[in-house]
Amino acid sequence: MAGEFRLLSHLCSRGSKVGELAQDTRTSLKTSWYLLGPAFVAAIAYVDPGNVAANVSSGAQFGYLLLWVIVAANVMAALVQYLSAKLGLVTGRSLPEAIGKRMGRPARLAYWAQAEIVAMATDVAEVIGGAIALRIMFNLPLPIGGIITGVVSLLLLTIQDRRGQRLFERVITALLLVIAIGFTASFFVVTPPPNAVLGGLAPRFQGTESVLLAAAIMGATVMPHAVYLHSGLARDRHGHPDPGPQRRRLLRVTRWDVGLAMLIAGGVNAAMLLVAALNMRGRGDTASIEGAYHAVHDTLGATIAVLFAVGLLASGLASSSVGAYAGAMIMQGLLHWSVPMLVRRLITLGPALAILTLGFDPTRTLVLSQVVLSFGIPFAVLPLVKLTGSPAVMGGDTNHRATTWVGWVVAVMVSLLNVMLIYLTVTG
């Protein structure tokens, strides 16, 4: 009897410990889930109107041929974004701050100038994308649509300023899900053939134009302002933990954060190309985003077309606010200036409204804005790999040697592809 009692006590004790372990696991998972968010804000840059233009053009012209480029670009981008967030967590500095600390004033001013031009080019693309969506949905003139996009993006930034980063992350994540629904809704009507999709994962090109579009996809995917921004987002959200278990845990959560966010962004980009390949191949009216909308309307119906336009609008609104946020972080980090967000919003909105008012082709302007962004890629990615591979900067959290080598390969490859994009665009 005593033996049975001891056995029962042992089982109860063991069950209690298992229950405590399960409770701790649930608490840990709940806490880890709460810590997700910064990467989802940065991921908005990967589903902006520039991506829509590049992916739709690729699918309409070459079908599934360049699907592998989207996959490769998103894998590269995931590594870059993780390194950016890691820098912010470990050093307590954003990438612009870490770079500016190592420069004299003239060099910092020059570096800020190129970064600011890139941020403004980003904003032009986002505002134009939102204006196109509003014209599609409500037949509004492009300048009016641009103003509305700018005002709404300012309201989103006001949430971040007055209610904190966590609520801002939730709103942006919700918009990311709207974008995902908008560009994947067509798969409920018709799905691409699996063999064709698998064939698109085999790396290959088909003439010079496919190389240009591949470079455009890469240029629209790895965005310099997202690289600058993510380091600051991670620092502001998680602080600057001391070396030890807490830092290791936050870095682990950050890997999950980046992985999930980039999986969604990559899936949306792939969906854009697949929708175009499935429904727009061979049509002559898909050279513009509006043409793509009409093609979706004709082949899949009004409901799917409206969801496509809603996805585009959410893309323009969310990415415009994120772009302005990145610009403010760049200025603060390099020049230690803090400009009121309203003033900054008006300054960056000016070029976009001028382009829309003067009657330039909006889709062509979107493509050219990606070329301007291409100039900024090396200035963001190369210093990031160097800093995160430096023991003097990162201490015991320096990149593993293999990670650093892969980072250099990715940085050089992305930079060369963007140089190729610039050359091919300039030479026609």
Curated annotation (Swiss-Prot):
One of its GO terms (cellular component) is plasma membrane. Pfam families: Nramp (PF01566). InterPro entries: NRAMP_fam (IPR001046). GO terms for molecular function: cadmium ion transmembrane transporter activity; manganese ion transmembrane transporter activity; metal ion binding; symporter activity. Induction: Up-regulated in response to iron and copper. This is Divalent metal cation transporter MntH. It comes from the Bacteria. Belongs to the NRAMP family. It is a multi-pass membrane protein. GO terms for biological process: iron ion transmembrane transport; manganese ion transmembrane transport; manganese ion transport; zinc ion import across plasma membrane. The gene is mntH. The keyword Cell cycle does not apply. The chain crosses the membrane at residues 33-53, 60-80, 114-134, 136-156, 171-191, 210-230, 258-278, 299-319, 334-356, 365-385, 406-426. Disruption phenotype: Disruption impairs growth under conditions of limited iron avaibility, but does not affect virulence in mice. Optimum pH is 5.5-6.5. Keywords: Cell membrane, Ion transport, Iron, Membrane, Symport, Transmembrane, Transmembrane helix, Transport, Zinc. It comes from Mycobacterium tuberculosis (strain ATCC 25618 / H37Rv). HAMAP family: NRAMP.
